């Protein structure tokens, strides 16, 4: 199977949750876990990785929490995948030519290289502000209705903007 790890999927949900909130809003990991249906056991490790990648900022102590380190419009899906997976490649030969002695002359390797570049380009072009704006008012999954104040800036069911004045 070609895919991403569960940790990467969970990281996407964390960044999406924060992207749907007004800029600089700080929330707890427990709130995100509850609202995005994430197992709390994985949260700390994922948050640390995202903070190391300068995607999230953490505040310790009483009143602490997490927030985006920069605007959602400056964070791409590619960055989150790299933070969690360390590299985005579909075949080890693409990024590590010494892995296979045939990689230099292999047409399959060149095909994988092209597909990998397309994937990286596509993921780099998807920003979290775009994803946050695409959140439906109600998710079909488990009655999720979005984070508090998530309606700010999103379209209402009647098609107009709601929240920000």
Predicted ranges, named:
Residues 34, 51-52:
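Alpha-helical residues within the helix-turn-helix
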Residues 13-21, 83:
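Short amphipathic alpha-helical elements of helix-turn-helix/winged-helix folds
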Residues 72-99, 108-118:
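Conserved segment of winged-helix/HTH DNA-binding domains
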Residues 1-15:
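Short alpha-helical segments that sit at the start of domains
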Residues 96-165:
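C-terminal regulatory/oligomerization modules of transcriptional regulators
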Residues 27-37:
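A short alpha-helical element within helix-turn-helix/winged-helix DNA-binding domains
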Residues 55-69:
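Beta-hairpin "wing" of winged helix-turn-helix
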